[in-house]
């Protein structure tokens, strides 16, 4: 499928400033594009969102009344009107490229015109604490399955199937990887540095996790110890269970980090332990907001014991709520993470009106 090009708006920060600036840890800028066809109901819906680390800062929705790229973070609002005009033009052009790509891919897979189909793309770059390039990436999917991805060398592609190999040959002939690499190593990094500087009051803050442990009897012989980390930012965190100092990786139940709804994140990790041996187990928490890793141990006198029956009842209700949230998140994700094919052939510009996404001539799938 056509690679959705993040607009190549090149932003020339002062090189000296950029390379002398220091930030805690690594940082990322990522764009997610999604196009969903809807036969009989007009043009496909196109949604694009941009993130710096775990903070959404821009959004475009072809179904929105404004039909414009819109700010989602206070620090991006300071950009000039030309920036927003350029971003909007790029998104509208991208949506049209995706419309064509949806038809092309339907042909590749010999699909009828009746069903709805989805194209998604994620691309972006990471920088280190010194502001220098660490890595770049682009991944495309069709109908929820991998389609084609840029390899770590930023010079070659991995196609998921025969249809994707057609796209791969087209992009290789058009030197798509070379142009994309120039964006990822140059424009993407420069804009990320700019955003980190402009949004430093929020983007560079950290919230240490609030931690506690709960105890859930399963039977007369076993109990579950659950280690909780709540209200932390950024999202990256490590929870590790140990027994007598040895990692219990294989025996740990671990959930993915989840948004808490207030800009922070939450996570838990659990182990099943023999009753009476709880003191042999420790939970270790590592996070950027902590001065040093935390070690938690079950203290029966100060922490709650929750019967597993009560938990199951609670989880039934909680699960229903989460199920609805997951469905909504998946739908949003598919809309927001779609990237059409874009050829990164347009020369980079220093005009800040262009923006930080890829805005190159579209190279279709």
From Swiss-Prot:
The modification Phosphotyrosine is found at residue 344. Residues 25-114 are annotated as: Alpha-1. GO terms for cellular component: early endosome membrane; ER to Golgi transport vesicle membrane; external side of plasma membrane; extracellular space; lumenal side of endoplasmic reticulum membrane; MHC class I protein complex; phagocytic vesicle membrane; recycling endosome membrane. It is a single-pass type I membrane protein. Residues 338-365 are annotated as: Disordered. Residues 25-308 are extracellular. It is found in: Membrane. This is Class I histocompatibility antigen, Gogo-A*0401 alpha chain.
């Amino acid at each position: 499928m056509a690679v959705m090009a993040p607009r190549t708006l090149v932003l020339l920060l002062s090189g000296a400033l950029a390379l002398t600036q220091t930030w805690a840890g690594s940082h990322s800028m990522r764009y997610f594009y999604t196009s969903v066809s809807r036969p009989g109901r007009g043009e496909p819906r196109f949604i694009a969102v941009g993130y710096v680390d775990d903070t959404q800062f821009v959004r475009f929705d072809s179904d929105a009344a404004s039909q414009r790229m819109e700010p989602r973070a206070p620090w991006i609002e300071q950009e000039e009107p030309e920036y927003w005009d350029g971003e909007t033009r790029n998104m509208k052009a991208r949506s049209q490229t995706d419309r064509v790509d949806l038809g092309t891919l339907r042909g590749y897979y010999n699909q009828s015109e009746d069903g709805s189909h989805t194209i998604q793309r994620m691309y972006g770059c990471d920088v280190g604490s010194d502001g220098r390039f660490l890595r770049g990436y682009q991944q495309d999917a069709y109908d929820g399955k991998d389609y084609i991805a840029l390899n770590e060398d930023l010079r070659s592609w991995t196609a998921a199937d025969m249809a994707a190999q057609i796209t791969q040959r087209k992009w290789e002939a058009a030197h798509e990887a070379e142009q994309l690499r120039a964006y990822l190593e140059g424009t993407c990094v420069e804009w990320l540095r700019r955003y980190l500087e402009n949004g430093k009051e929020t983007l560079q803050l950290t919230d240490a996790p609030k931690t506690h442990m709960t105890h859930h009897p399963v039977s007369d012989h076993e109990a579950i110890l659950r280690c909780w980390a709540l209200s932390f930012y950024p999202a990256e965190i490590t929870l590790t269970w140990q027994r007598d100092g040895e990692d219990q990786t294989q025996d740990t139940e671990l959930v993915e980090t989840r948004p808490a709804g207030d800009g922070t994140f939450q996570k838990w990790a659990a182990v099943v332990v023999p009753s009476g041996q709880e003191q042999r187990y420790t939970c270790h928490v590592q996070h950027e907001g902590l001065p040093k890793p935390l070690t938690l141990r079950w203290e029966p006198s100060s922490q709650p014991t929750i019967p597993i029956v009560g938990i199951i009842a609670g989880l039934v209700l909680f699960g229903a709520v989460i199920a609805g949230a997951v469905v909504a998140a998946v739908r949003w994700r598919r809309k927001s993470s779609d990237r059409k094919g874009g050829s990164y052939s347009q020369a980079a510009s220093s005009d800040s009106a262009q923006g930080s996404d890829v805005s190159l001539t579209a190279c279709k799938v």
